[in-house]
Amino acid sequence: MIKYYDRKTQTYQIEKVAGEKMIRWTYSSPVGMRLLETVVKKRMCSSFYGWYLDRPISRRKIHPFVCKFDLDLSIAEKNLKEFSSFNDFFYRKLKPSARSIDPCQDSLISLGDGKLLAYEDIDLDCLVQVKGLTYSLKELIKDPETASKYKRGTCLILRLCPTDYHRFHFIDSGICEPSHRIKGSYYSVNPVALQKVAKLFCENKREWSIFHSDHFGDILTIEVGATFVGSIIQSYTPHQPVARGDEKGYFKFGGSTVLLFFEENKIKIDPDIVEQTKLGYETYVLFGEKVGVRHKRR
């Protein structure tokens, strides 16, 4: 059971997890862990399933998925019959009216829909995965020089579960450098898996880039793939100016995670999100929603 904080109702909710029984069995039983290490975490397994979900025959999975998780397709650009495959449905675009971007330029907005954790004044060699498990930023991006820029900065972790909108966006205007790809495994990013696999983000396939934002400094963006995530698609053009809210990319099928690292004294996260993180709970947010503000120098 995964509890998260709904800041709109100020209550705790239970997440509906796609494939929950299978995830718990895989990461909690000896047989499941053996299968995980020999088959599930391998690229071939995710690539094959991704290939299937790109085929028209996978369309038959869409309607049961929508019904089971009570998804609102009225906010999607396409209707149910227009999706060419399950993946086409999975990384669906939303109507412009579906999400509103906080109008204040000093507001730090969420890059997408998902469950958010926030850590301030971070120790680069002791980043929190879950209580008791840590990793380092230089291990994560394999670039010690770049990692050192974010000493005592802020880290945001947005977890996208399979039922979420799976496109991610720029949180400010600016210019983004090309993405660096790092090969890796395909562990789940579900909290159950995060409690079982040490340095999971450093083990999984991932991509990172530096976004030179106009209002929040140089932001390190890291997209992490997961089980059955066939691809991390970057839809932006490197070195070209982007506007606040422009799409950066999207994930194909699977749960996924995006991490943002900010330099010291660039942002201040909303107190409720920081408090819930300290209590061990993620906060549910939507793309464009205010999650913090620009740090005002005195």
UniProtKB/Swiss-Prot annotation:
What do the Gene Ontology cellular component annotations say?
Answer: plasma membrane
Q: Where is this site: Cleavage (non-hydrolytic)?
A: 255-256
Which domain of life, per UniProt?
Answer: Bacteria
Q: Does this UniProt record's set of keywords contain Manganese?
A: no
Q: Cell membrane among the record's keywords?
A: yes
How does the cofactor attach, per the note?
Binds 1 pyruvoyl group covalently per subunit.
Q: What topology in the membrane does the UniProt record assign?
A: Peripheral membrane protein
Catalytic activity field = a 1,2-diacyl-sn-glycero-3-phospho-L-serine + H(+) = a 1,2-diacyl-sn-glycero-3-phosphoethanolamine + CO2
Q: Which GO terms describe its biological process?
A: phosphatidylethanolamine biosynthetic process
Question: Which EC numbers does the record give?
Answer: 4.1.1.65
Q: Name one GO molecular function term.
A: phosphatidylserine decarboxylase activity
Localization annotation:
Cell membrane
InterPro entries, alphabetized: PS_Dcarbxylase, PSD-B, PSD_type2_pro
Pyruvic acid (Ser) PTM positions read 256
Catalytic-site annotation from UniProt: 113, 169, 256
Q: Pathway of this protein?
A: Phospholipid metabolism; phosphatidylethanolamine biosynthesis; phosphatidylethanolamine from CDP-diacylglycerol: step 2/2
Q: What is its main location?
A: membrane
Sorted keywords for this record are: Cell membrane, Decarboxylase, Lipid biosynthesis, Lipid metabolism, Lyase, Membrane, Phospholipid biosynthesis, Phospholipid metabolism, Pyruvate, Zymogen
Report TM segments. none
State one Pfam family annotation: PS_Dcarbxylase
Q: Which HAMAP family match?
A: PS_decarb_PSD_B_type2
NCBIfam families from the xrefs? PRK00723.1, PS_decarb
What job does this protein perform?
Answer: Catalyzes the formation of phosphatidylethanolamine (PtdEtn) from phosphatidylserine (PtdSer).
The family note in this entry says: Belongs to the phosphatidylserine decarboxylase family. PSD-B subfamily. Prokaryotic type II sub-subfamily.
Q: What is this protein called?
A: Phosphatidylserine decarboxylase proenzyme
Q: Which organism is it from?
A: Desulfitobacterium hafniense (strain Y51)
